[in-house]
Amino acid sequence: MISITEWQKIGVGITGFGVFFILFGILLYFDSVLLAFGNLLFLTGLSLIIGLRRTFAFFFQRHKLKGTSFFLGGVAIVLLRWPLLGMLLEAYGFISLFKGFFPVVFGFLGSAFNIPFLSTLFQKLQGSSSSMV
């Protein structure tokens, strides 16, 4: 069984608050203060979850430098109160950094259709027509 330290639990909470502030900042028409606060919380929480050394090693791998520069550059642009441009740069950097994780996430979401309760829920949401045409 995986043991989770108290610092990692705090990191999950801080990362969750960071994602919340980022989404709330986007909902409020790219409020630069909320986006900047969310970015700082997200990066702090990530470093608490996986550790400073692993965070640094993840972001500064040779094949991920382009994504890292766009992501951290976007964070800097948001901190300089250019939220729309900063979030666009961050989004591109995020996709570049985490593109290796997307197949795993989509595979997990695809397996959610095999869970008994969720499969019936998805069928009800889909409607009575099971035809693909």
UniProtKB/Swiss-Prot annotation:
TM spans (from-to): 10-30, 32-52, 69-89, 93-113
Pfam families tied to this protein: Got1
Residue numbers on the Cytoplasmic membrane side: 1-9, 53-68, 114-133
GO biological process, one term: retrograde transport, endosome to Golgi
Subcellular location, record wording: Golgi apparatus membrane
InterPro entries in UniProt: Got1, Vesicle_transpt_Got1/SFT2
Record's keyword annotation contains Transmembrane helix: yes
Entry GO CC: cytosol; endoplasmic reticulum; Golgi cis cisterna; Golgi membrane; nuclear envelope; trans-Golgi network
Sorted UniProt keywords: Golgi apparatus, Membrane, Protein transport, Transmembrane, Transmembrane helix, Transport
Main subcellular localisation: Golgi
Organism domain of life: Eukaryota
Keyword RNA-binding tagged: no
Membrane topology: Multi-pass membrane protein
Signal peptide region: none
Segments on the Lumenal side according to the record's topology features: 31, 90-92
Function: May be involved in fusion of ER-derived transport vesicles with the Golgi complex.
Family statement: Belongs to the GOT1 family.
Name of the protein in its database record: Vesicle transport protein GOT1A
Encoding gene, per UniProt annotation: Golt1a
